[in-house]
Every structure is written in C-alpha cells, then in structure tokens.
C-alpha cells in the first residue's frame, strides 16, 4: 500500500471515528482524504500571511505542518502528536491566522499553554507570523498584573494566548469574551489534560458560547491513556496525527548515559550526594568543545546547588527555576538566548515547549520517575530542534539505571553507555 512521505500531494485516510495520519505506516483506503502540500503557496494562504511566514525563515512546511494545517483550515478538530522541535507551534499558528478574520474586532482564537514561558513563546510566534496582517495578540498569564491584561483585552485582540488560571480569571470577571471563539488550541495537551489543569481547561471550554461548533486542536509530543480519554470527551470526529517516529524516539538525538556506579556512601547533604555528578559534568565542560547546553535536574533546590557549585568553579552559567520571579525567569531566558552563559541549569520549567536556537547538548543529572516518563522525552527534545542533530547525556548512579532502562524499553529507544573516547564534535 501507499505510504505517507514528505512529497507534495500525499494523501491520508479518513475513518468513521476520525482521520488518522501515521508516518511510515500503510494507509487503509476510505472514502475521504486530506491533502498535504509541499510548499506554502499550495495552501492558498493569505498574501500577508505568506509574507510573515517567509520573513521568519519558514522556507517549506515541516511534516507536522503539512499534516495539521489543512485540516484546521478545513474546519476539523485535530489531535496531533509529534516529536519535540518539529514545528507544532508554527502549524497551529499558521492555520489559526489563515482562518482568523482580521476585519472583526473580536477574539476568535484562544490558545492555552501550561507555563508563562511557553505561552509567551507562542504569542511571539503569532505576532511574528501575523505582523503584516494587522493581527492583534494578547498574552494572559500569571505573574503579570491584572491591570495590564485588562489593557491588552481592551485593544480587542484577535488572538489570546495564555495560561489556564489567568484566562479563566479574565473570563470570570467578564474581561475576556468567549462569544466569537472559532478555534480553541490546547498546547502541550498531555500536561494540560492532567489533573492539575484538566478542570480549568474543561471550565474554559464550557464558557465558549458556540462550543458545539468551535474547532479544537490539541498538540503534544506525548499522550498517556488518561489524556487520550479526556480528549475523546471534547473532540468531534477528529483528525488524529501521529508522527512519533518509532514510538517516541526523537529523530536526530543521540542518547547516552554515564554510570557512576554507587552513590557516595557518606554524605552530609545534597551537595555531597551530587558531587560525583557535578565533577563528571565539569570534566566534560572542560575537556570538550561545546556550544550552549541545558542541565536538567528534578528539584529547584538541587538546581540551585548545581548552579552555585559551577559558579564557584568559575563556569559561566544561568539558572532558571520556580524560585525565581516571573520577571527574573524571562530575563534569564533572554540572556541565555542572547549567548550569555555556556549552560542553563533548569529544574524542569524548560522541559516543555521552550525553543532555544543552536542548542545541541542536554545533560540530565537525574532520571524522572517512570510515572513521569514523558518528562524525559520533553527534556531531551530541547536539543535537536527542527531536524538538527542533538545529544542527550544522562549522568546517573547505579540505582537510577533501572528506571532509565525502563523508560528506554517503554519508548522503544536506545540509550547507550557513553564511550570513553566520545567527542561532541
């Protein structure tokens, strides 16, 4: 049978329960098909939107963009799953701007994200793509003054991007109207449909005036059974896009571990426990020629220990964690994106959604629990963005290897022991 490829005018099948797009799998025949295109011009996009697309360097659609844009333009619900860094944000932003009527001074597109950082990044992408269209975009998220959000909404934005708590609050105080929403986007949907956000998302959805007609688009790199169940409650005859490349393996990212064997037998505190990992990390930094990297560790307390230790050893780095204010986190991200600091220490805020150009190496100083296994995929997905090559290094103790190997088996991926003569070049 015919397979989905990245060539122009490929087709995918539609089933009674929805349309399913899977790369590298045979397609079953059916009566209706969704067409994918190889160039932006083939979509019949607005001229000013095309100008915005080319102005930010989007030369051709990525595979997820080919698969997702047309169904949204055609009015379909979608649930999309694709590896990190493949252009999911661009997919829903382009489609949303195409269907948005800029002559109407009402909010038509609502995008929810789990953190302010991701929401801000999404809002910036809408602004960049819609810069020639007169698109008005409002960012609503915790950490910013309510008064500023009211001012933003008074400008009658076409598109609102925000975090669930702040969006729900602005709806409750009658500052954000749900009367004209035509597209509801849930980004990082696996996180948004978990218990922490699920009720807020459902509450916001219930407030949409025409919820029986509104389109819903869900995007994520991973989904668990619970999130899939919840999605089925609100999606109608959706297009299911599954582009995970062999059960979640992140294409282009080489994964390794360094086994430090036993953890320190005698220790006075967390720094003593982490010391062998810190020494190993520092040794790599000194001996290898690396660009910018991110170092992930689970807790904000441990992130502070790693940061302080590296600073004491005169290694230039930045720290981002929940202990910082929102303004401090934004300044840190902007400095790092601007080239300040060789590495960024993160307690997990950046494991989802954040795009940092020219990042090729991710270090993980611990292993997420198996229950939070998707965190591993999101962590290492910070490298190898948009088809570039990336490297992920897990620095672990012997007792952590069991969990790492369980994640390896679950995602049908390969995590090798780092060779002694390995070079990052």
UniProtKB/Swiss-Prot annotation:
GO molecular function: ATP binding; ATP hydrolysis activity; RNA binding; RNA helicase activity; translation initiation factor activity
Localization in the cell: Cytoplasm
InterPro entries per UniProt: DEAD/DEAH_box_helicase_dom, DEAD_box_RNA_helicase, Helicase_ATP-bd, Helicase_C-like, P-loop_NTPase, RNA-helicase_DEAD-box_CS, RNA_helicase_DEAD_Q_motif
Domain Helicase C-terminal span(s) in chain numbering: 252-425
Record carries keyword RNA-binding: yes
EC number: 3.6.4.13
Residues noted as binding ATP in the record, renumbered to the chain: 82-89
Catalytic activity: ATP + H2O = ADP + phosphate + H(+)
Keyword annotations from UniProtKB, A to Z: ATP-binding, Cytoplasm, Helicase, Hydrolase, Initiation factor, Nucleotide-binding, Protein biosynthesis, RNA-binding
Family, as annotated: Belongs to the DEAD box helicase family. eIF4A subfamily.
Superkingdom in the source lineage: Eukaryota
Domain Helicase ATP-binding: residue ranges: 69-241
Protein role: ATP-dependent RNA helicase which is a subunit of the eIF4F complex involved in cap recognition and is required for mRNA binding to ribosome. In the current model of translation initiation, eIF4A unwinds RNA secondary structures in the 5'-UTR of mRNAs which is necessary to allow efficient binding of the small ribosomal subunit, and subsequent scanning for the initiator codon.
Gene Ontology CC terms: cytosol
Gene3D superfamilies: P-loop containing nucleotide triphosphate hydrolases
Motif extent (Q motif): 38-66
Pfam families, sorted: DEAD, Helicase_C
Top class in the EC scheme: hydrolase
Subunit structure: Component of the eIF4F complex, which composition varies with external and internal environmental conditions. It is composed of at least eIF4A, eIF4E and eIF4G.
Protein's name according to its UniProt entry: ATP-dependent RNA helicase eIF4A
Domain notes: The Q motif is unique to and characteristic of the DEAD box family of RNA helicases and controls ATP binding and hydrolysis.
Major localisation: cytoplasm
Motif residue range(s): DEAD box: 187-190
